[in-house]
C-alpha cells in the first residue's frame, strides 16, 4: 500500500532517490548528484521540504512532488518544482494523489495560483497537467552561442559599462520590469545564485543591464527602448566576455512582445 508523507518528515536520501528514479527515463538525460539536488532544488528553485510530498511503498520512495511558495508577479503562487514517479509505479494514481496533496497545501497557505514548467515533447506530462486544469500561458525558449566572435565590436564611445553590486542592479532595473519573467530568471532566484552584474550608462544614466554567471548563463539582459540597435546590448556582452573569459553564452526566456 502506498503511503504519503511530507518530505520534511523523512530522510533527505528518500527524497533524492525518488527524484533520481523518477527522472531515470526522462527525455533529457539528467545526472544530478545528491549535493547538487539539495543545492539547486532546495535552494534557488525555492522548493521547501515542508511544502513537498513523498510517496512510499514500504520503505522505498516511489514518487515525489516538490513545492515552493512565494509572491510571484504580485500573486501568491505555489510552484511545482518537480513531479517524479518511479517508472514501475506510473498509471496507478500516484501522480494524482501527489498533486492532490500539492493543491491542498497551496489552498491551506492562501495561494491564488498553481504554476509549473514542462518540457516540449513530454506529452504524457502535458496531458496529465491539462487534465488537472492547467493552461499554457507562456513558451520558454533556450539559445546557446558557442562562437563568441559573433559578438562584434561596435563604436560605442558614449556607452560606459560598469560592474554593479546586486542591490544596485535590483533597484536600477525596477523601471523596466513590466513584463513576464520566468521563475528561474526573476530577482529572487538571481539573488540566491552566483552572478555578475553590469550596467551600461549613457551620461551616468542606466540604459541597459546584464546579469550573467561565470559559465556564460544569462539570467537578465535588457536595453531601454530608446537606446536599442545602437550597440548597448552588444557592449554589455563584450565586456562580460572579456572580463569573465567566457567561451560560450546561453539564455532562456519566455515569449514576450518586447
Across the structure, where does each feature detected by a protein language model lie?
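Conserved GNAT acetyl-CoA-binding A-motif
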Residues: 106-117, 244-255
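A short beta-loop-alpha structural element at the N-terminal edge
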Residues: 2-17, 154-172
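Acetyl-CoA-dependent GNAT
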Residues: 21-76, 81, 86, 167-219
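Alpha-helical interaction/dimerization surfaces of two-component signaling modules
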Residues: 18-22, 105, 128, 132
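Conserved active-site alpha-helix within GNAT-family acetyltransferase domains
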Residues: 92, 96, 108, 120-138, ...
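Residue-level recognition of the GNAT/N-acetyltransferase active site
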Residues: 81, 86, 90, 119, ...
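Conserved acetyl-CoA-binding loop-helix of GNAT-fold acetyltransferases
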Residues: 85, 91-104, 130-131, 229-242
Amino acid at each position: 500500500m502506498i503511503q504519503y508523507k511530507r518530505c520534511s518528515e523523512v530522510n533527505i536520501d528518500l527524497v533524492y532517490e525518488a527524484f533520481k528514479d523518477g527522472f531515470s527515463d526522462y527525455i533529457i538525460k539528467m545526472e544530478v548528484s545528491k549535493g547538487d539536488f539539495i543545492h539547486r532544488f532546495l535552494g534557488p528553485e525555492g522548493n521547501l521540504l515542508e511544502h513537498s510530498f513523498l510517496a512510499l511503498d514500504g520503505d522505498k520512495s516511489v514518487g515525489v512532488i516538490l513545492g515552493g511558495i512565494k509572491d510571484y508577479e504580485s500573486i501568491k503562487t505555489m510552484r511545482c518544482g518537480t513531479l517524479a514517479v518511479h517508472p514501475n509505479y506510473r498509471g496507478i494514481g500516484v501522480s494524482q494523489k501527489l498533486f492532490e496533496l500539492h493543491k491542498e497545501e497551496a489552498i491551506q497557505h492562501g495561494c491564488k495560483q498553481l504554476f509549473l514548467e514542462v518540457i516540449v515533447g513530454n506529452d504524457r506530462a502535458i496531458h496529465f497537467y491539462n487534465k488537472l486544469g492547467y493552461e499554457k500561458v507562456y513558451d520558454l525558449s533556450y539559445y546557446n552561442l558557442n562562437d563568441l566572435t559573433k559578438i562584434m565590436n561596435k563604436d560605442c564611445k558614449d556607452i560606459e559599462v560598469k560592474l554593479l553590486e546586486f542591490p544596485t542592479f535590483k533597484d536600477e532595473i525596477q523601471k523596466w520590469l513590466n513584463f513576464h519573467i520566468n521563475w528561474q530568471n526573476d530577482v529572487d532566484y538571481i539573488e540566491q545564485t552566483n552572478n555578475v552584474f553590469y550596467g551600461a550608462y549613457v551620461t551616468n544614466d542606466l540604459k541597459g543591464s546584464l546579469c550573467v554567471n561565470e559559465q556564460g548563463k544569462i539570467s537578465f539582459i535588457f536595453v531601454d527602448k530608446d537606446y536599442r540597435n545602437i550597440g548597448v546590448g552588444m557592449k554589455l556582452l563584450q565586456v562580460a566576455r572579456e572580463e569573465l573569459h567566457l567561451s560560450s553564452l546561453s539564455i532562456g526566456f519566455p515569449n514576450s512582445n518586447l
